Amino acid sequence: MHSRKSKSITGKRKQVGSNVTRVIKPQKTRRIIRRFHHLINKRQSICKFLCLKENLDDSNEEKNDKIIRLSIKGNVRLGKYYEDGKSQSFNDAMESQLLRLHSLIKNESKSKDTSDLAVMYTLLGYIMNQINKLGGLETYQIASQNGQLKERGGDTSKLLEKWIRSSFENCPGAVALEIGSLSSGNRISRCALFRNVVRIDLEEHEGVIKQDFMERPLPRNENDKFDLISCSLVLNFVKNHRDRGAMCHRMVKFLKPQGYIFIVLPQACVTHSRYCDKTLLQNLLGSIGLIMLNSHQSNKLYYCLYQLQVVPPQPSSFSKRIKVNDGPGLNNFGITL
């Protein structure tokens, strides 16, 4: 008789102790990745507000729980709020508070009284429980890797190869940087156009270095720069419009003269945003020296390829968000420089 534990997360039965690769259904992968990033970002904001002495480790939730408990050691009341949050299943009230977290932190940053701490530790407990129910880092990594499988249509670099092949076929020494890499087996790594592909991500995978691009040391010389930078489904996870702009600026610093940047965004970022559309994005990137060579919009994604100009870029007029659309149901994705 099969136990419940002998099932994989897809519901298929699996031998206990086997090395069978767990597979997540394609319709679930993007939802899991998005949910994981949402929870991690909210947790980081709360921990920064609470000034925890030790940074959390997204790969070790048991350790994280101990760090949080240590921060409230001796405070029975805050411990109770934390446990209360951990006991709550998914609910609209808590999700609503997470969506309003930035405003909550802004309003409470001056006081940090007992009621403020109670709210934050309750939310922190809720997030910890949600991450645990999601399956933690292991499930996130499986979802990420499944999303890159060729048979699931998840490799966004297939279109990139088509666009750049003629430019790189006769450049044997070309090097590329893939930000937010999910797999060492995607097209950018297998197309044989690059002497070396440096793959980085916030989480370590096989063939992928654990590194935050914003903390990567700046190039010391041209040899440290890249002919191509791929930034696929990364900018949309950066927490605010200013940080997205800072990331765009930083990518330019890593490019060789006339180097290329490949950007992929969820389609909604340029079709259903109050502060961004395809024209604004093109003009904004143009202001930092990037000209668009190709673009493509699918049912769910927007792909674009830019090249660094030789001429100096124009002064930026994108220091504030510009409303380009208005109405219900729009998101607030935007980029400022």
Curated annotation (Swiss-Prot):
Keyword terms, alphabetized: Methyltransferase, Nucleus, S-adenosyl-L-methionine, Transferase
Recorded phenotype for the gene knockout or disruption: Loss of N(1)-methyladenine(2142) in 25S rRNA. Confers anisomycin and peroxide sensitivity to the cells as well as slight defects in ribosome subunit joining.
Tagged with keyword Nucleus: yes
Reactions catalysed: adenosine(2142) in 25S rRNA + S-adenosyl-L-methionine = N(1)-methyladenosine(2142) in 25S rRNA + S-adenosyl-L-homocysteine + H(+)
Record-listed E.C. numbers: 2.1.1.286
Ligand binding (S-adenosyl-L-methionine): G180, D201
Cellular component aspect of the GO annotation: nucleolus
Example of a GO MF term: rRNA (adenine) methyltransferase activity
One Pfam family in the UniProt entry: Bmt2
Consequence of substituting G180R: Abolishes methyltransferase activity
Enzyme class: transferase
Top-rank taxon: Eukaryota
InterPro entries: Bmt2/SAMTOR, SAM-dependent_MTases_sf
Subcellular location(s) per record: Nucleus, Nucleolus
Further information: Present with 623 molecules/cell in log phase SD medium.
Family stated for the protein in its record: Belongs to the BMT2 family.
Function: S-adenosyl-L-methionine-dependent methyltransferase that specifically methylates the N(1) position of adenine 2142 in 25S rRNA. N(1)-methyladenine(2142) in 25S rRNA is present in helix 65, a region that accounts for most of the intersubunit surface of the large subunit.
Record protein name field: 25S rRNA (adenine(2142)-N(1))-methyltransferase
